[in-house]
A protein has these predicted regions:
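Long, ordered, helix-rich scaffold segments
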Residues: 1-281
Length: 281
């Protein structure tokens, strides 16, 4: 998959064609790392590199076929586990979320799949992002998992709430307060960027750039880098985000280390726009 992925990133192959290649061939991939990379790339292709006009259709297809791959995989295999995790990351249609809910409730089972604490959080976060669960379910899950990992997973799930209020609370918890460790900042960013309706992130284009210099000057490098990388509203991946990023770079010649981080984020958006243009053909 690697060479085809490079061509997809370069805007030479349509994202939907890369997705089809992976879905048609990934079942026979027997090397765990290669499988993990292929599934991560499949997710990026469907969520970011696809043309917006047919993105929802592609995502629905990807999720449905990942569920089928999960059901068909050898019970207890690494493939089965990775297919299920990726399915949970992209599930958005009602029928797909029904499977997630049933697995979490125990009303549906897959031979070989054990719902441990980590997988339980991933399934719950999928339901939260899909509007099927909320703060009560997150609080209950955290009460049952009083570990550092549980706290991180709860922060990610809360930040994935698909409402303007949820995104604002996630933003405020780490940008306006300076009390959380790097691990919580990082997982909050993961949940914040998870948005089936990417327009939830639109208000943060301006807020992000307004706050950059301040967090760079006031936080440790590790925290600042986690904020800058984790809360850049990259799921928007459109001309408005690109132009705002270019404008900030034009207006801020210093400091070089901060500019370097932002320039790398700009490169990602520009790459996504090229890929989207190709996928629209």
């Amino acid at each position: 998959f690697a060479s085809v992925w490079d061509a997809t990133r370069d805007g030479e192959i349509r994202a939907r064609d890369y997705a089809r290649l992976v879905l048609d061939n990934v079942a026979t991939e027997d090397e765990s790392t290669a499988l993990r990379y292929a599934l991560a790339q499949l997710t990026v292709a469907a969520t970011t590199y696809s043309a917006p006009d047919h993105r929802d259709e592609l995502l629905a297809t990807v999720a449905s076929e990942l569920w089928a791959l999960t059901a068909q995989a050898a019970p207890g295999s690494d493939n089965q586990f990775q297919f299920l995790r990726t399915f949970a990351q992209v599930a958005a249609e009602p029928a797909q979320l029904d499977h997630v809910q049933a697995l979490l409730d125990g009303t549906e089972t897959l031979e070989g799949v054990e719902i441990d604490a980590d997988l339980r959080w991933e399934l719950l976060t999928a339901l939260v992002a899909g509007g099927r669960a909320g703060t009560a379910e997150i609080d209950a899950a955290l009460a049952a998992d009083r570990t550092a990992t549980g706290a991180q997973s709860a922060a990610q799930a809360r930040a994935a709430l698909p409402t303007a209020e949820g995104k604002q609370a996630a933003w405020a918890s780490v940008w306006e307060a300076d009390t959380e460790p790097n691990t919580i900042v990082r997982t909050t960013g993961l949940g914040f960027r998870r948005a089936a309706d990417v327009e939830l992130l639109r208000p943060y284009v301006g807020a992000y750039f307004d706050a950059l210099q301040g967090v760079w000057e006031s936080r440790s490098y590790a925290i600042a880098a986690a904020l800058i990388g984790g809360f850049y509203p990259s799921p928007l991946a459109d001309a408005e985000l690109r132009d705002a990023t270019v404008a900030w770079l034009d207006a801020n010649p210093e400091p070089p280390a901060l500019r370097r981080l932002v320039s790398e984020l700009l490169s990602g958006v520009e790459r996504a726009l090229r890929a989207q243009a190709k996928d629209a053909e």
